[in-house]
Every structure is written in C-alpha cells, then in structure tokens.
C-alpha cells in the first residue's frame, strides 16, 4: 500500500540497503563492498518478479549505489526474467521506473558508463555516501567521474542536478 500511495502522490521511493544480519561472510568491509549493492539488487529483482512495477505503473524508485549489480548483469537478469515471470518484459522496460544515484565513491568513469548505457542520462542522479565515506572520495570522486565521462555537457548537468529537480518536481 505504501508504494501504491507514493505512486499516486508522485513521490519517488528511495531504496537503500540494510545490514544483512546473520550473514557470516559479511566481514572485514565486505558489507560496504558487496553486501549493500547486493541487497539493493535483490530488492529490485524481487520487485520485478513480484510484479510490483507491473501493478504500480506510476511507481518511481531511486536505487542507491548506482543500482548495485543491476546495470552490470543485464543479460543474466533478462534471461531470468523470461524464465521466472509471466509479464514478458525485459529489464530495459523496468528501468523506465528506476533512477540510480552515483554513490560508488570513486572516480570510476567505467562504472558510470555501464549505468549510463542502461539507465540513460535522464535516470541518473548525483549521489554520495557522505558523511559515511570520506567526502573527497564520495563527493569529489563522483563529481570527477561525471565531469570526465564522455557524454555531452548538457547530460552532465542533468546528472548533477537537473534530473533530481525534475524527479522531485522543483524545476
């Protein structure tokens, strides 16, 4: 009901991972490196195969950490969507309802471009992990990656603020 109401009101829903309690392999920093991006990816997967995006067509979600593993595993995701859902849709159909932030905490143009190739310039929002991560890495690194990306300046400005203004209805 919450997701349906958010869609009715035009509110985007921010999906941020939680600690995976009781998972013994999540030690020595692996939660931040793998756990949270995995948790985000799993949540989105469950929303796709559970029909949430199909049932709530106006739902818009913002995924932290550049969508976790979603942009990197599109082929595998599409294979499994075909096998495990009745909706006959591809990941590329669902991403119209998804936005991702740039909180990958570094100057990785390559990571940004993988997300860009799936989500396009309109569905990427500037984001950071500050204050939990050093601001130079989280904010400065993400800014540097966007500025260095081989995309038009107008799209960089969209990512740096224009998309968020549009999504939140403040433009």
Q: Where are the predicted features?
A:
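Catalytic pocket-lining loop regions of alpha/beta-barrel enzymes
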Residues: 1-125
